Amino acid sequence: MKQYDYLIVGAGLYGAVFAHEAKKVGKKCLVIDKRSHIAGNIYTEPVEGINVHRYGAHIFHTNNKTVWQYVNQFAEFNRYTNSPVANYHGEIYNLPFNMNTFNKMWGVVTPAEAKARIEQQKAEAGITDPQNLEEQAISLVGTDIYEKLIKGYTGKQWGRPCTELPAFIIKRLPVRFTYDNNYFNALYQGIPNGGYTAMVENMLEGTEVRLNVDYLADREALNALADKVVYTGPVDAYFGYRLGALQYRSVRFETEVLDTDNYQGNAVVNYTDAETPYTRIIEHKHFEFGTQPKTVISREYSAEWNKGDEPYYPVNDAKNGALYAEYKQLADAEPGVIFGGRLGEYKYYDMDKVIEAALDVVQKELA
């Protein structure tokens, strides 16, 4: 008989939910992670008394009451509402695109005026069959919004001009004709008081966790410890990249402590011009309404991904989609292994959807 029922590779949200649920019904789990900390990309660490989101801003939002009640077992959430702003050459615009944005851009006051301005610009552009992201965006919101708030930012995000990006990346652009700056129209929203790491710690309470353990480097010995494996690492790496590497975008952060109590007045400021090299600046204290004497900011740079870099966003184009479909066939046929999470399923996953997926899988598994 093996020592554990489940070896869970990855101490992020998916792995932690699975471990918590399995432990509840008496299963013995070992959670391992190759990093030196738990919580995966939602890891927060205290700096100057401020919970810093080491891998970028994570704002919990969901319409799923079950998921909301689930996370509230492990943390108390504050009332933070995501209302980012865009800085275009020193002009500040509210996001998502709404009446505050249009008023600042054109001086319009009513929804009818804003709609008329957008329709006029769309008509002037005359695009009926968008061939790239630039044409797609202009056909949806007109030239002014595109030039000031989409073009530079999106180009930086993807590392190539919008004219070279496929139209399907932007299926729709949320345009609101109300004076509402709430980015996520979710029923439940907030940040866990004390940060995400403490929340994941509570999920993993009573479960054995080993850090700085590279599963792929010691697979046989680790597999021998448990009856089944839950793998939340990169699916292509699991199979030794035998079909080729899936592509990601990576992100690089420059984080610094500043001797001021308030640097930018908002948690998230996007820099939407092409000239500023970073895509946004995060001021972490505003996520928890901090009043500390100092502040911590992170400049976020989008970067090409190379093997060995931290993978952030899957490149969801046709080529990578087809390659993942082949890997999924291999994964489905792999005996005794459950693949899950952002990297295990090669998908962009909001936190609530990760929890939903993990609960769904673990309930079927333990039924």
Predicted regions and their residues:
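Dinucleotide-binding Rossmann-like beta1-alpha1 core, especially the glycine-rich loop
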Residues: 48-123
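Short, solvent-exposed loop/turn segments at secondary-structure junctions
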Residues: 13-14, 36-38, 100, 155, ...
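Active-site/ligand-binding neighborhood in enzyme catalytic cores
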Residues: 89-93, 99-228, 232-239
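Glycine-rich FAD pyrophosphate-binding loop
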Residues: 20-48
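N-terminal Rossmann-like FAD-binding beta1-loop-alpha1 element of flavoenzymes
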Residues: 4-31, 362, 366
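Short, well-ordered alpha-helix to beta-strand connector turns
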Residues: 4, 26, 207, 225-227, ...
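C-terminal catalytic lobe of FAD-dependent flavoproteins
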Residues: 310-367
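Mid-domain catalytic core of redox enzymes
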Residues: 215-330
